[in-house]
Amino acid sequence: MKFITQINEIKNKVSGEILFNESLSKYSWFNLGGLAKVIFKPKNLNELSIFLKNIQEENKVKVLGAGSNTLIRDGGFDGVIIKFGKTFSHVSLLKENILISGASALDKKVSNFALNNALTGFEFLSCIPGTIGGAIKMNSGCYGEDISKILISVQVMDLSGNIKVIPSSQIKFHYRGSDLDDDLIFLSATFAGKT
């Protein structure tokens, strides 16, 4: 009950949607999964930070991307699921060969954006379901390419609501993973393409 009271207090500080006992099956490509105690859909970075700063540390927090590579147990999730919306799915050019993408942008969207802007190196993303956040989390790849080869940096938020940027040179990538802390929430990333 204390948890629900705490979430209701946070509701007064944010305008993003907060759902209680929501079925996770509608967020999974497999249409499986039990209930999440809470799903929070922040409207922006500030709301996400406020939410995390006001939630107690003992509560479990996980981000759910596209749900394309996620199997959710029937018992659900006894904690908070963060679900990003369109605000976190932007894709744009920073420079001629530097692309920035929100963590919830679909991999295919990023690949298509690169193609439309005459950037190479992103082709492999076109056949990977999921989001850029998930791609970084698991070092997605195929056909001899992976996300670590094009990543410049990733912007993250810790569970205390603090933001930092981690250069790819400080990340140890391996096959379908990295040494990034599991508690980090990916917000956006910059990538280098070839013109």
What label would you give each PLM region?
Residues 33, 40-45, 71-89, 137-167, ...:
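Structural signature of FAD isoalloxazine-binding scaffolds in flavoprotein oxidoreductases
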Residues 194-195:
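Short, intrinsically disordered, charge-balanced linker/junction segments flanking boundaries
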Residues 24, 167-169:
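Generic detection of intrinsically disordered/low-complexity segments and helix-coil linkers/edges
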Residues 3-132:
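Anion-binding (especially nucleotide phosphate/pyrophosphate-binding) glycine-rich loop
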Residues 170-179:
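Flexible, small-/acidic-enriched active-site or ligand-binding loops
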